[in-house]
Amino acid sequence: MEKSSFFNSVSHDRTYKAEDWAEYFASFIGNGVFPVPSTGLQVVANDGMKLNVKTGKAWINGYFYFNTGDLAVELDTADGQLNRIDRVVVRWDLTNRVMSVKVKSSSFSASPTAPALQRDADVYELALADIYVGAGVTAITQSKITDQRLNTSLCGVVAAVVQQIDTAAFNAQLQAWFAEYQ
């Protein structure tokens, strides 16, 4: 099937949905957080088990997220015996038509691992930070927060999808043309 867009509507014969625009933008803008300011969507310790997610923007699958002010996030109480890792994510939820910051918690363990990111047709997550929640702690310090925004496998920064053009086919055609006319 052929598709084309975007044309002006004459007598409402051209209507476009959000997913049409998202598909268009996703073809040249990759997923990630916007790098300016450098503190965009940074997770910082606040008071007790509270964190702040700084003002910032993210882009997932052609959709835009904007946190316009410090967003307070509270972690669950620590276990008395075992540790866990909480992961702060920006979640794109197509079913509910929303993007938001969420906290995911690992299982309690002597050696916990961060919860996996969900990345499927309906939900896509970018990890902003991992927080080590030690047994019995009542406050999170900045040293327990691992910033994941620059980790390209977990988050990364917004960049052009086309990083480099493969010119091999064009080069082969050009070489064949030169060979024919020499």
Q: What is each model feature region?
A:
Residues 1-59:
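N-terminal "first-domain core" detector
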Residues 5-6, 50-182:
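Beta-strand-rich solenoidal segments
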